[in-house]
Curated annotation (Swiss-Prot):
Its EC number is 5.4.99.12. It comes from Escherichia coli O1:K1 / APEC. One of its GO terms (biological process) is tRNA pseudouridine synthesis. The keyword Transmembrane helix does not apply. This is tRNA pseudouridine synthase A. Homodimer. Substrate binds at residue 118.
Length: 270
């Protein structure tokens, strides 16, 4: 077939929501369940050809997403309903497409992104939850959310996050730019909301682990600033559990005009 006869290639972006509790992370791996593998299988069924997706951020085992963004290329010409309702019909109940948008050739779910936003949900109660046990992290000591918020503000701007970086992190640099970090209480729930240009491995969970020590009055408010300055992961608290973490939004330049659905999760407004 000559070049003139090649079918056109379409580039499509999707918004994805998933409960990560039954998966070994986003990334496709041999012999274990991954969100990517389930999504690619469903897309391939609708497209009637093999589909490979590229995501904005690869979440770890047990981590959830309400605002994950992916893109893929296909020669299949389908209506939007096929990429949403049709794909959802082929997905397990804990993964769903939220929106679809045709994007130009220069769009890339990861490399076009300008910021990522995560929310970490702590169920702060003496007794553990049952219904949402895989969607929140239980912490039984009373937490002072206002104290946590004040302590976290030293993390704003460009900083070296070595103290909050996993030992096995493969990023070339520990420097990241945090645009906002807010800690708020909603009844028994404490929510840590953090947005940055990018994150080193386990950065949000490591920050939350240390903030909980401050919130429980086990460490002074100044401790977070001291950890940041020390650039030593061994001095910080243990990594917070995966189940409370959600990728809630990814920012892109306005020219792509991607949909911006409510971030959530659950009861949380934007």
């Amino acid at each position: 077939m000559s070049d003139q006869q090649q079918p056109p290639v379409y580039k499509i972006a999707l918004g994805i929501e998933y409960d990560g509790s039954r998966y070994y992370g986003w990334q496709r791996q041999n012999e274990v369940r991954s969100v990517q593998e389930k999504l690619e299988k469903a897309l391939s069924q609708v497209a009637n050809e093999p589909i490979t997706v590229f995501c904005a951020g690869r979440t770890d085992a047990g981590v959830h997403g309400t605002g994950q963004v992916v893109h893929f290329e296909t020669t299949a010409q389908r209506k939007d309903a096929a990429w949403t309702l049709g794909v959802n019909a082929n997905l397990p109940g804990d993964i769903a497409v939220r929106w679809v948008k045709a994007v130009p050739d220069d769009f890339h779910a990861r490399f076009s992104a300008t910021a990522r936003r995560y929310r970490y949900i702590i169920y702060n109660h003496r007794l553990r939850p049952a219904v949402l046990s895989k969607g929140v992290t239980h912490f039984y000591e009373p937490l002072d959310a206002e104290r946590m918020h004040r302590a976290a503000q030293c993390l704003l701007g460009e900083n070296d996050f070595t103290s909050f970086r996993a030992v096995q992190c493969q990023s070339r640099t520990p420097w990241r730019n945090v645009m906002h970090i807010n800690v708020t209480r909603h009844g028994p729930y404490v929510v840590v909301d953090i947005k940055a240009n990018a994150f080193v491995h386990h950065m949000v969970r490591n920050i939350v682990g240390s903030l909980m020590e401050v919130g429980a009055h086990n460490q002074p408010e100044s401790w977070i600033a001291e950890l940041l300055a020390a650039k030593d992961r061994t001095l910080a608290a243990a990594t917070a559990k995966a189940e409370g973490l959600y990728l809630v939004a990814v920012d892109y330049p306005d020219r792509y005009d991607l949909p911006k659905p409510p971030m959530g999760p659950l009861f949380l407004a934007d």
